[in-house]
Amino acid sequence: MIFVNSGAGLQTWAGFSAYSASKYALTALADALRAEERGTVRVTSLHPGRVATDMQVELSALQGRPYRAADYLDPAEVARAVRLAVELAPGASAESIRLS
């Protein structure tokens, strides 16, 4: 099971309290499921930093700054991290992957 979370599930910033709270809750859910299903289901929390998505385009506009895709993670990097977690050898696990 892969939870695509956010860097906000590991760290919080002023002005993003509700968003961070929801991401910390997702981290806790993944941790609880991992403990409950240990040995039967692998649970990975993926915490990408800022990814080049429409959300970042909108945030840039709201903050009055230009959007530059080069400043963000390529979505393909997130996909590669998911694939890495899925293709681990039996018995191996990646409890948390952080991309920045």
Segments (PLM) and residue ranges:
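Short beta-loop-alpha junction of Rossmann-like oxidoreductase domains
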Residues: 41, 50-59
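Rossmann-fold scaffold of SDR-type NAD(P)-dependent oxidoreductases
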Residues: 3, 44
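Active-site loop immediately N-terminal to the catalytic Tyr-X3-Lys motif
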Residues: 11-17
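Short glycine/proline- and charge-enriched loop/turn segments
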Residues: 57-67
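Active-site-adjacent segment of SDR/Rossmann-fold oxidoreductases
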Residues: 11, 32-41
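C-terminal helical subdomain
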Residues: 45-46, 66-100
